[in-house]
Amino acid sequence: MMDINEIREYLPHRYPFLLVDRVTELDIENKNIRAYKNVSVNEPFFNGHFPQHPIMPGVLIIEAMAQAAGILAFKMLDSKPSDGTLYYFVGSDKLRFRQPVFPGDKLVLEATFLSSKRQIWKFECKATVDGKAVCSAEIICAERKL
């Protein structure tokens, strides 16, 4: 549905912080998105987290979910960062980690729009690997004009 070139139009992030590789489903009417991140052993964070037992840092799983939610928000508004709008990750509620993410995993990211009020957007998000829950949270983003 969206390859990395189109994703780069909707996210301001770049290597090594672009954490969405592909969008496989995007339903504006039902306000949800499904995307994924291929987790490679070559990710820079694996050098220190942890060298003998590499796992993806939880904060980066949360960030990946927030980036998927950001793409959904931009698509819902029919805008892009180049239009002068950004979404900042400002918080999370109901955050839970279920299992670690390892090199070689395909991290599937899902986000559903819940609400917005005064440029504060809330999304229900989850991340899975091989159909098993890895992380879930309500992600809160602030819409800001540059």
Curated annotation (Swiss-Prot):
Keywords: Cytoplasm, Lipid A biosynthesis, Lipid biosynthesis, Lipid metabolism, Lyase. Its main location: cytoplasm. Its EC number is 4.2.1.59. It comes from the Bacteria. It is found in: Cytoplasm. Pfam families: FabA. Coiled coil: none annotated. The active site is at residue 49. It is an enzyme of class 4 (lyase). It catalyses: a (3R)-hydroxyacyl-[ACP] = a (2E)-enoyl-[ACP] + H2O. GO terms for molecular function: (3R)-hydroxyacyl-[acyl-carrier-protein] dehydratase activity. GO terms for biological process: fatty acid biosynthetic process; lipid A biosynthetic process. GO terms for cellular component: cytoplasm; membrane. Belongs to the thioester dehydratase family. FabZ subfamily. NCBIfam families: fabZ, PRK00006.1. Involved in unsaturated fatty acids biosynthesis. Catalyzes the dehydration of short chain beta-hydroxyacyl-ACPs and long chain saturated and unsaturated beta-hydroxyacyl-ACPs. PANTHER family: 3-HYDROXYACYL-[ACYL-CARRIER-PROTEIN] DEHYDRATASE. This is 3-hydroxyacyl-[acyl-carrier-protein] dehydratase FabZ. The gene is fabZ.
